[in-house]
Amino acid sequence: MQEEKQGLPMQIRKPRSFEDVEEIINCFKQKMTVIVYVNELNNSTALRVVDILSGAIYALGGGMAELERDMYIFNPDGVTAK
């Protein structure tokens, strides 16, 4: 059983293009929780961004959830949003 970690850093990101995805994935690698707003992207780009980020966080053992329309939270392995 994994212990829940508290007090980890959090980032809030608003990607403006698909090219911003790599920077967000680097936050995942540093075990940061990241809230991502995709409301400034067109629908097809927003879908691509969320698909790539969800695959990346899954590959790193973390998880994600939709908080509201166009807002997602990505948690590293061992961190649960409350």
Mark where each language-model region is.
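N-terminal leader/presequence segments that are low-structure
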Residues: 1-12
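Conserved, well-folded catalytic cores of nucleic-acid-processing
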Residues: 3-4, 27, 31, 52-60
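Conserved beta-strand segments of the P-loop GTPase G domain that flank and frequently precede/overlap
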Residues: 12-15, 36-39, 75
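Helical mechanochemical/support elements of P-loop NTPase systems and associated helical scaffolds
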Residues: 17-24, 42-49, 56
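Short capping/connector residues at structural and topological boundaries
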Residues: 23-26, 72
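Short glycine-rich, basic-tinged beta-strand/loop micro-motifs
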Residues: 28-40
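Residue-level "edge-of-site" marker
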Residues: 40-41, 70
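Short basic, glycine-rich beta-strand/loop surfaces that mediate nucleic-acid
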Residues: 49-61, 65-82
